[in-house]
């Protein structure tokens, strides 16, 4: 079992704030392994995929009263008939108990969940392997970009095409169909594969519907399902009401670089491919470090674009530019952004080794750093 201290620390921090932690992430991202890393002495593990789990939890009060461990893990809890009731009883009647509930979607994904846990749960979004975890996996950054960060693919000696195909079929059958009752696998997969090929670019619903020959409402409902199940992140534009800012057009980032390179047929990777895939790793680092915060980008009508921005206090907005090579940075867009928002830090994120350092480019002060600055923002 690979030790993942980043996520273990995040779990403990979340439990210090609320009794229930919802560990969400796509299929095969390592949720079960992370849950089992708590150990049998500390935690009671319940696999909700098994029919016996429903019978075991028929009387939740009795179940929790008989539990002799401080932590209960409900793996794939959405498979239960009434998961909300189980979690509510745990939070209300057994406040000292800590619960880890896992699923491949957010709590909002299923009609089985009601909003009865306000203030008593914390979301932990388990993204594919972070750059800071690559040493533990025995993988290089090149492997992470090419294979992706789902542990079975990342640990494979060569890129396994069958893994990606099987995952896509399983994702539809076990997540999409069960949660949303979509029936047309061909139409759904056509949209998903289109999104994978367009990943990292702006996503226009009307253009997508036209390209695939399906209705706009169908595209919107399928995109919503992908977003809820965390297979897709829509990065929406940040704006403060300034004239000339883009306010509506989102960019779409698929959940894993391995699937993006697989769908695009990138074999081997070229330098231009690495730059786009590096952006995906930045999105995942944002999600891991600041769970619950939306990821934003900035663009004006003149075409100047800053890869990612993060508001940090009143009138203070940090800017993040991503480059596979730090030497390729062009400050034009960042200078335009700072005319709108003069306060904030500027980061140039590149796959550098060693410590972060500062530099000045055309009057702009930059911090050049790797993703460790995002993955460990408080250190």
Regions found by a protein language model. Give the residues of each.
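Pre-Walker A adenine-sensing motif
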Residues: 1-15
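Hydrophobic positions on the alpha1 helix immediately C-terminal to the Walker A/P-loop
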Residues: 34, 38
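Structural recognition of the conserved hydrophobic beta-strand(s) that form the central parallel beta-sheet
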Residues: 73, 98-104, 125
């Amino acid at each position: 079992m690979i030790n993942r201290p980043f996520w273990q620390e995040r779990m403990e921090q979340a439990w210090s704030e609320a009794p229930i932690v919802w560990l969400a992430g796509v299929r095969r991202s390592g949720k079960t392994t992370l849950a089992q890393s708590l150990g049998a002495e500390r935690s009671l593990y319940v696999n909700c995929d098994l029919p016996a789990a429903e019978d075991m939890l028929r009387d939740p009060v009795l179940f929790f009263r008989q539990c002799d461990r401080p932590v209960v893990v409900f793996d794939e809890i959405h498979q239960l008939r009434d998961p909300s009731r189980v979690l509510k009883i745990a939070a209300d009647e057994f406040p000292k108990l800590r619960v880890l509930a896992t699923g491949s979607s957010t709590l909002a994904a299923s009609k089985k969940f009601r909003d009865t846990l306000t203030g008593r749960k914390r979301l932990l979004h388990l993204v594919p392997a972070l750059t800071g975890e690559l040493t533990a996996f025995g993988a290089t950054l090149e492997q992470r970009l090419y294979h992706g960060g789902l542990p079975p693919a990342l640990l494979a000696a060569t890129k396994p095409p069958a893994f990606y195909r099987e995952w896509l079929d399983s994702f539809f059958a076990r997540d999409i169909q069960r949660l949303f009752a979509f029936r047309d696998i061909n139409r759904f997969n056509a949209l998903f594969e289109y999104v994978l090929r367009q990943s990292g670019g702006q996503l226009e619903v009307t253009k997508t519907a036209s390209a695939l020959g399906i209705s706009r409402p169908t595209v919107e409902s399928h995109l919503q399902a992908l977003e809820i199940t965390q297979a897709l992140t829509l990065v929406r534009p940040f704006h403060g009401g300034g004239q000339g800012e883009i306010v509506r057009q989102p960019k779409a980032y698929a959940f894993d670089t391995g699937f993006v390179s697989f769908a695009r047929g990138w074999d081997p990777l070229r330098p231009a491919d690495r730059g786009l895939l590096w952006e995906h790793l930045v999105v995942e680092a944002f999600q891991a470090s600041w769970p619950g915060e939306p990821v934003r980008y900035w663009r004006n009508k003149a075409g100047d674009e800053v890869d990612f921005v993060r508001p940090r206090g009143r009138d203070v907005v940090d800017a993040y530019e991503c480059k596979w090579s730090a030497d390729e940075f062009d400050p034009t867009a960042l200078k335009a952004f700072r005319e709108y928002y003069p306060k904030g830090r500027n980061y140039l994120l590149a796959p550098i080794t060693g410590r972060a350092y500062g530099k000045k480019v055309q009057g702009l002060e930059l911090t050049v750093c790797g993703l460790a600055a995002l993955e460990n923002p408080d250190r």
